[in-house]
Amino acid sequence: MQTAFDVIVIGGGHAGCEAAAAAARLGARTALLTHRFSTVGAMSCNPAIGGLGKGHLVREVDALDGLMGQVADAGGIQFRMLNRRKGPAVRGPRAQADRKLYAAAMQAAIRAIANLTVIEAEADDLLTADGRITGIRLADGREFSTGAVVVTTGTFLRGLIHLGEQSWPAGRIDEAPALGLSAAFERIGFALGRLKTGTPARLDGKTIYWEAVEMQPGDDPPEPFSVLTARISNPQILCGITRTTPATHDLIRANVHRSPMYSGQIQSSGPRYCPSIEDKIVRFGDRDGHQIFLEPEGLDDATVYPNGISTSLPEEVQRGILATIPGLERCNMLRPGYAIEYDHVDPRELQPTLQAKRMRGLFLAGQINGTTGYEEAAAQGLVAGLNAARCAGGGEGVVFDRADGYLGVMIDDLVTRGITEPYRMFTSRAEYRLTLRADNADQRLTDQGIAHGLVGAERAAFHRRKMAALAAAKTWARSLAVTPNEAAKHGLALNRDGVRRSAFELLAYPEVGWDDVRRIWPELGAVEPAIAVHLEIDAKYDVYLQRQTADVEAFRRDEGLVLTDIDYSLVPGLSNEARGKLEKARPRTVGQAGRLDGITPAALGILAAYLRREARRRPATA
């Protein structure tokens, strides 16, 4: 067997698959290390991809030729565009997935990638020399040499499952944890923290009384994640919605002392925006009920995931809780819910490329960086895999910034501010939401992906055709114009000012849609429907995008002021507090420094002035 690789990825979850695929797409000889190939692409918690903010990340991964979007399309059994009634900037594509179909599609995608070798084994140690990674050692003693390692261990680092008063070591249910790697990180000098997440019970859908719950259909037709997916071919299913009751809340209150989170058994922080049902009752006890989404796990699988009642209460209490919920009174619980604690690294130990500051060639992605969610993991994995391949090949790292995409927002948040609880992506975290929409991820990122060698020939050709068609349609729409009187003949009431307005300008009006301009110019029917959607959104946001472009340019100016190897003790005028924070964080740019807690606008002005003085001094002393 081959024992030398350019890149080795440890872990075959959502981050690991994207990391391995990205590195291999760049031509790096890549190994994906996983305990069992049959678990590659496993959905450890909820059987769904996307959502608010998260759906943006999936589209961005797809724009960079990642796997998740196409795999979700292959496994999706209910697609919904969340926030459809709101503006395009905050809409979030989401898909309910068939667990088996999703995993099978991911495994098939991994098998089909050139330059990628899958090794079924456990990593036990990281091999280093002179401040850089040189290889890994497996639990069976074998060693592999490499130019870069991407660690994507999810919840496996010293994972510990909690169920009521019981606890036992595990990476997820029925799978062993990874112990050796935690020791390796500590030996290198990382201070590891602990985080917690949880999952609800699994139910037998054949024993749910579906007549007692509200049924929720998906969108018709379903909208795919990937631009390369022509249509969704899987049968589409309904999900159910029920609620907890006062009896549910009383039972939880009576037993909350038996929850590991409240007994003191678990000390670590869980995800604020995905709380356990115990947390919901303690924190929001005045509510009459909490929604529960009953999500089927597959087309030929009766298992149902009750989204909204994650818990680690004892098994018998969980059964009692189900008996108080409409539709679930007599359902069979196939597996109890549980909580899991695991090690993580402070993401401020990382550069924006996701390479560790203290160890060249070591990259981290996913839950090890303090995030929660498949989509957050996948986006980090892609960036880490890209940069690991470039590092192994002697190239410079690639940084996606906050104006590039939600993946840039997430990584900047992590490496600049760190985390105190599992990090989840929301649209509210982004400053440039009008620009960073789910519908334009390919317009923002695919050209960058092509430039970095991430994007294959099929997607590159498709992208060029699409961009050419969009540009042509926009030019055409700007060339067609009507007077207010002419528009009135077609039912459009405009200000009678005699000014001719183009089709593109008409589309900017909130009450004017594509069908309205087609009534005036039937020839616009030749524009592809997908292109017409983009054209209308661009027109609606045009004025606002011009303003946001100015904001982005100002942001990029600050990001262009690089703080490389600065001795902050030599910068006059900085407070001791600012010096200490800058020395500890070592921000890459003035822009990143401004996002540190406690760094004032005055301190940023001092830094910018210092950089200008140093720039003037260099030519004089050269």
UniProtKB/Swiss-Prot annotation:
Compartment(s) of residence: Cytoplasm
One GO MF term attached to the UniProt entry: flavin adenine dinucleotide binding
Ligand binding (NAD(+)): 270-284
Gene3D superfamilies per UniProt: FAD/NAD(P)-binding domain, GidA associated domain, C-terminal subdomain, tRNA uridine 5-carboxymethylaminomethyl modification enzyme MnmG/GidA
GO biological process, one term: tRNA wobble uridine modification
An annotated GO cellular component: cytosol
Annotated residues for binding of FAD: 11-16
Reported cofactor(s): FAD
Top-level taxonomic group: Bacteria
Keyword annotations of the record: Cytoplasm, FAD, Flavoprotein, NAD, tRNA processing
Major site of localization recorded for this protein: cytoplasm
Keyword Hydrolase recorded: no
Record's keyword annotation contains tRNA processing: yes
InterPro entries linked to this entry: FAD/NAD-bd_sf, GIDA_C_N, MnmG, MnmG-rel, MnmG-rel_CS, MnmG_C, MnmG_C_subdom, MnmG_C_subdom_sf
Self-association and partners: Homodimer. Heterotetramer of two MnmE and two MnmG subunits.
Summary of the function given for this chain in its UniProt record: NAD-binding protein involved in the addition of a carboxymethylaminomethyl (cmnm) group at the wobble position (U34) of certain tRNAs, forming tRNA-cmnm(5)s(2)U34.
Assigned protein family: Belongs to the MnmG family.
Protein name per Swiss-Prot or TrEMBL: tRNA uridine 5-carboxymethylaminomethyl modification enzyme MnmG
Native species: Rhodopseudomonas palustris (strain BisA53)
Gene name in the database record: mnmG
